[in-house]
Amino acid sequence: MATERTLSIIKPDATRRNLTGKINAVFEDAGLRIVAQKRVQLSEAEAGAFYAVHKDRPFYGELVSFMVSGPVVLQVLEGENAVLKHRDVMGATDPKKAAPGTVRAQFAESIEANSVHGSDSLENANTEIAFFFAQTEILP
């Protein structure tokens, strides 16, 4: 098993309801370690650039608007097989299909306001982490 790092974003629907601590506890209970974390207000340019891969999808505009609707918590999580473990702990994108105990089953309001984002591959994790964090902001 390899120690990996992945990007996690606690989205505006969750920060608005002060769920950061509860979500962090789910991650940590699953064996993921928070090695960087910051609470920020994304600009439209930042959110648009981050989600540029979805630019041609019908939900892109709404996604960008949602991601700038309030503060987000950006995190780098570390652990054994962190990318897959984080995705398992987040649960299905649609909270109605998310397994009990997952972040989305517990906290998501809808498929759009689903509380968290997580990298979908190790390659994307590295790209996404570098988008938001300087190496000096991440614990060794």
Curated annotation (Swiss-Prot):
Active site: H117
SMART domains per the UniProt record, alphabetical: NDK
Residues where ATP binds: K11, F59, R87, T93, R104, N114
Catalytic activity: a 2'-deoxyribonucleoside 5'-diphosphate + ATP = a 2'-deoxyribonucleoside 5'-triphosphate + ADP; a ribonucleoside 5'-diphosphate + ATP = a ribonucleoside 5'-triphosphate + ADP
GO MF term set: ATP binding; metal ion binding; nucleoside diphosphate kinase activity
Homology family: Belongs to the NDK family.
Name of this protein: Nucleoside diphosphate kinase
Name of the encoding gene: ndk
